[in-house]
């Protein structure tokens, strides 16, 4: 087969991910592999996409080979997906088999894979295999064996001529443009400051939603338009930020100032984005990737966060999951999420107003919602990586994690360890085993009942 590898790394040839597809090329010499550094050359693809599309047309199999970048693909790879659709060229991909191969540290790799699967299936491709490699897997013989087995199965499936059926739902069209009503009754901002960031161009529905929030909030609010914000380029994956959280772009454009000054000053942060394909725009993604100047540290601790979204978010469960992940990781509280899905100005206005009120109220009482699996699981992945292999070059993260007690490994819980060791020994004695098992449900609620009892007897107990 002629196999075309579409590389998603901004590092081009120096991509870790491409080492995995090259390994497959070595193990399966009967197939002809060709690489294109799509993300690294997206600026030239903006001018000339034709050559690449000709290669796609000739290919028997297309491999989307990409690194994870903030729950998704890199902004430049995202831009490539947009270009194909803007120029109505997706028919070149239709009817072809696709493989997805990602490398990462497995922090929300599933959302990136789901995004690329959705895009490939939207273009009429059949996804014959999905592989999520840890970035260092290739050095382990067991992982090489696994990848080789994947290749054998996936290439056979791709060559069979039978395309697997699609697993993602087609994305719904969206043509609604919100236009606000005049004269909003203001929310009392109680001295709080709001930062509103949008990728909505003037005249778009999402821009109008962002501006509406600003008007309602009154007081101290600032709107950052990502279309006007100077951005020299996307994250280059150079990891210089790992040492001291200084981005290689420095203050040569406007991104660092938004994260370092405007975001830090704000009490309420509003992200106002329009859905573009299955995510936000590549412009928004460029800004989001550059958030990595704070590497693996939360950058919105204690802030209230509001999302304003234009588009059918309820049909994009994957994107909804990314929103939760991002905010649970950022340390902020997702106070409200408003979309223009009601397609009704008055209802959307009410929802925006409700969001502003909710954010103020949550801030007043200092509410932070507990994290779900997205935040709890993700924090454990980072904790273990920064403690271990990634301590260098992520020196600044290690410092932060130590200072903020992020190294909460279970092996430090001596009391719990002693108790479970004792119980594990005692359970071998039949009489004790019977007694424990009979009363297991009671054992589990006993400590909670004790708390309730102390509150009942002294209601002042926190
Ligand atoms: C800015 C940035 C963002 C990243 N985001 C994620 C992420 O969300 N999840 C993850 O597991 N790994 C993430 N990574 C790790 C890379 O995906 C991983 O190192 C990958 O193997 C790099 O491959 P490449 O050399 O082909 O670019 C990120 C790395 C960088 C530099």
PLM ranges: what are they?
Residues 1-87, 151-155, 165-293, 350-356, ...:
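N-terminal beta1-alpha1-beta2 submodule of the flavodoxin-like/Rossmannoid cofactor-binding fold
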Residues 121-167, 329-367:
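A charged, well-structured terminal subsegment
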Residues 229, 276-278, 313-314, 342-344:
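Short, catalytically relevant binding-site loops at active-site mouths
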Residues 89-92, 296-299:
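Surface-exposed acidic, glycine-flexible loop patches that form ligand/cofactor-binding
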Residues 4-7, 307, 342-349:
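Ligand-binding pocket scaffold of soluble enzyme catalytic domains
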Residues 260-263, 297-300, 326:
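Short, conserved, surface-exposed binding loops centered on an aromatic residue
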Residues 111-112, 142, 207-208, 282, ...:
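A short secondary-structure junction signal
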């Amino acid at each position: 087969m002629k196999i075309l590898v579409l590389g998603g790394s901004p590092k081009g040839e120096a991509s870790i991910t491409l080492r995995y597809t090259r390994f497959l090329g070595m193990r399966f010499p009967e197939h002809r592999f060709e690489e294109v550094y799509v993300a690294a050359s997206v600026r030239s693809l903006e001018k000339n996409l034709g050559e690449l599309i000709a290669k796609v047309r000739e290919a028997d199999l297309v491999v989307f080979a990409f690194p994870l970048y903030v729950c998704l693909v890199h902004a430049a790879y995202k831009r490539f997906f947009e270009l194909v659709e803007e120029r109505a060229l997706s028919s070149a991909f239709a009817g072809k088999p696709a493989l997805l191969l990602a490398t990462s540290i497995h922090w929300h790799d599933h959302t990136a894979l789901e995004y690329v699967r959705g895009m490939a299936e939207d273009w009429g491709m059949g996804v014959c295999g999905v592989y999520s490699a840890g970035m260092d897997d290739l050095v382990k013989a067991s992982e090489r064996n696994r990848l080789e087995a994947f290749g054998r199965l996936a290439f056979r499936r791709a060559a069979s001529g039978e395309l697997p059926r699609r697993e993602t739902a087609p994305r719904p069209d969206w043509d609604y443009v919100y236009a606000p009503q005049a004269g909003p009754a203001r929310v009392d901002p109680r001295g709080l400051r709001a930062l509103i960031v949008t990728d909505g161009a003037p005249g778009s529905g999402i821009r109008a939603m962002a501006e509406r929030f600003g008007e309602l909030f009154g007081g101290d609010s600032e709107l950052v338009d990502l279309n006007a914000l100077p951005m020299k380029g996307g994250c280059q994956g150079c990891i210089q930020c790992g040492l001291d959280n200084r981005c290689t772009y420095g203050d040569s454009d406007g991104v660092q100032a938004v994260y370092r000054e405007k975001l830090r000053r704000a009490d309420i942060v509003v992200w106002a984005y329009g859905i573009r394909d299955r995510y936000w725009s590549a412009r928004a993604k460029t800004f989001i990737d550059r958030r990595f100047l704070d590497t693996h540290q939360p950058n919105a601790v204690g802030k209230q966060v509001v999302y304003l979204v234009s588009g059918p978010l309820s049909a994009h469960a994957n994107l909804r999951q990314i929103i939760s992940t991002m905010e649970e990781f950022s340390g902020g509280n997702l106070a409200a999420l408003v979309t223009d899905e009601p397609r009704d100005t008055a209802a959307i206005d009410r929802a925006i107003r409700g969001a502003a009120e909710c954010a103020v109220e949550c801030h007043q009482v200092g509410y932070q919602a507990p994290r779900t699996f997205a935040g709890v699981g993700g924090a454990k992945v980072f904790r273990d990586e920064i403690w271990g292999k990634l301590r260098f070059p992520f020196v600044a993260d290690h410092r932060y994690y130590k200072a903020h007690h992020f190294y909460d490994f279970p092996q430090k819980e001596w009391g719990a360890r002693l108790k479970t060791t004792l119980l594990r020994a005692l359970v071998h004695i039949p009489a004790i085993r019977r007694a424990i098992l009979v009363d297991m449900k009671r054992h589990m609620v006993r400590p909670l009942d004790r708390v309730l009892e102390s509150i009942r007897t002294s209601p002042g107990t926190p």
